[in-house]
Amino acid sequence: MPMKVKKSSFAGDGLKKKVCPSWESDKNQVSQLNKSIMHAKVYQITKRRVDKENYLNENTLTQGDSSDYDYCSEISEEERAESIDTLVNQILPKGMFTLVGSDELVFNGGNYEWIHKWVDAIHKKSDEVTAENVTHWIGAAYQLQKVINNPLGTDSHFYLSESTTQTFAEPSAELMRMVCKLRKGERLYIGRIIDYHF
């Protein structure tokens, strides 16, 4: 499966090749990656169980030009179960949550250790930013931004609202800010999960 990279909004107009020697190779890399069909999930995760009329749906989020989503679509119950398994066992930090039933996540702790690892990762990435590479299209500055906004390293987004008035979902940093305030034994609830293309 090809690596998924979010489209960059940095155009770099007016920069000369002499200033950014890797510009052309960066552009070619992005061009090749964007040719792949890229899908991910939006998970509705809340502190209280949400009524079904407040479930996220394929029309909740702003889609198309100037948004993170080309289009959104519903998923089957089978795909929902697979997506929840992926969330618990691959996306969230290992052992931090236990799935109870089909839609409850019980917090097991571990946020203190996790947040220190996140800070270490931010420091490591910031040390890699230099005057020579800060202007690279997908360079060290971009990688630093990714680890700050998306510490779980997932293309999935998270809809943390308990109503459907919010028209956007958020990267994993916002989910983990919510998680880091939980006490052991507290629960989160999984509402609707939708697929999106980007």
Please annotate each region the language model reported.
Residues 65-161:
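Low-complexity, serine/threonine/proline-enriched polar segments
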Residues 7-14, 19-20:
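Positively charged N-terminal leader segments that act as targeting/secretion signals
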Residues 10-11, 24-27, 33, 78, ...:
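Serine/proline-rich low-complexity intrinsically disordered segments, especially terminal tails, linkers
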Residues 21-71, 188-198:
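Short, extreme N-terminal segment that most often corresponds to the first beta-strand
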Residues 5-7, 42:
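Generic extreme N-terminus detector
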Residues 1-3:
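Methionine residue identity
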Residues 26-32, 144-146, 172-182:
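Intrinsically disordered, low-complexity boundary segments flanking structured domains
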Residues 158-198:
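Acidic, proline/glycine-rich low-complexity IDRs
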